[in-house]
């Protein structure tokens, strides 16, 4: 019977997180109503489950939820998380504070970690960060490969004077595509803009936090600069995948594989 509660909490979490990820990807925002519905449903299911089947877990439930809330708040106020990301982890803590091993056994035994038994949301968090890092590694490798194949510098003109930090962010989150393709793909955002200065008519600058607001204006400025042959046809762009997508993938990975970081540690330490 307890397995029905766990299955319900997993299903509810996946439904809300998949919707939130889709909404964040398409509109760059998630309605608060998602969390307003998700949180109480998750809390009620968890409380009822532990009251009926495992009363001794209630104090540890409070510990898991409290610790996850603290981490989510710290990440939000330090700028590491957006509001939706923090709320997602809080809701996950209410729904899935402990390992779902009773319902989903990880594919390999190494996926079962001590952390998952007490702080399952932190396993989802570490999986999410690892998957996001792997995505950044792939994009960086792609850019290096393009640099070698085409014998072109990463940054040209005034972009050369941008800081190393900005260049690194662009290299691990974006790639160069033709302006026409950028116009056609609504979900891809420009990572550079044109700035009018006294000394130069068209100075290129990197945009490391692309936003939906002003996207069309940036594209117009870039198009005019390309038409005047001030810059070439390829501009730095990013799909700007929201962290919520990685959180959702991290949850699915935790259900199927368990704690990926623990698996890697176990593998390298033998």
Residue ranges: model-predicted function:
Residues 1-270:
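A membrane-topology feature that recognizes alpha-helical transmembrane segments
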